Amino acid sequence: MLVIEGLTCRFGSKAAVDAASFSIDRGSFVGVIGRSGAGKSTLLRMLNRLAEPSEGRILFEGVDVTALQGRELRQWRARSAMIFQQFNLVGRLDVLTNVLMGRLAHVPAWRSLAQVWPEKDRALAMSALDQFDIAPLAAQRADQLSGGQQQRVAIARALVQEPDLILADEPIASLDPRNTKVVMDALLRINKHFGITVLCNLHSLDLARSYCDRLIGMANGRIVFDGAPAELTDSIARELYDLEADDVMGSAPVHAPIGALVPQLGTVAA
């Protein structure tokens, strides 16, 4: 279980996240929603320790994540894989090598520097690419891919980290509707088939309601809603999004898939 206690992040006198407290059970798919600047990205970056909390604690399975340093902190960052809006791929490297970067915490430094990857890791990376129908692109440069393809590569890279938790920060913000569905389906597949907890920042309420089993709403750095998607009424949503409400509530729902293919990578969730 992930437990957040009074988590706060200040930049000068402004609190980007203000006393956030909640807990998340293993295997959940949680959407973090709210208008731009609500504190969603800062919250996820604190959970991965890319941003340092000013106050509060992050506990995972009883371990105080906020106290981790050095090797233990690097191990935590591998266990809590980040997926970014900007993809964060190395454009000049091929797709397979970009995915293998997710194995950095599992191999000696000289192997990654020399790009001499163990065969088992290469097989793992290819299996991850195959999960998202991009294995044929393994030898292609990352900067030659479409935005949707690049985000699927980033998700495959996160999966080979063998994480307990995936933190997706606006993963579909720059994508068209077709690629948005492909990427959200990929995250749902990871969650349902591998039992990996997913915490995903989303701007679209339709997507959040379709894919997530729980929503956490933020406004001005504070958590103002925490519940099932069905509990988020339009009136609450309009208060949450204020002037942006018409933009995030105006499109038709994108329904989550009823079924998915049997995975080939890792352990299937019970």
Swiss-Prot record:
Binding site for ATP: G34, R35, S36, G37, A38, G39, K40, S41
Cystine pairings recorded for this chain: none
Gene3D superfamilies: P-loop containing nucleotide triphosphate hydrolases
Membrane topology category: Peripheral membrane protein
Stretches assigned to the ABC transporter domain: 2-245
This protein's UniProt keywords: ATP-binding, Cell inner membrane, Cell membrane, Membrane, Nucleotide-binding, Phosphonate transport, Translocase, Transport
Localization: Cell inner membrane
GO molecular function: ABC-type phosphonate transporter activity; ATP binding; ATP hydrolysis activity
Protein task: Part of the ABC transporter complex PhnCDE involved in phosphonates import. Responsible for energy coupling to the transport system.
Self-association and partners: The complex is composed of two ATP-binding proteins (PhnC), two transmembrane proteins (PhnE) and a solute-binding protein (PhnD).
Family in the record: Belongs to the ABC transporter superfamily. Phosphonates importer (TC 3.A.1.9.1) family.
Protein name: Phosphonates import ATP-binding protein PhnC
Gene, per the UniProt record: phnC
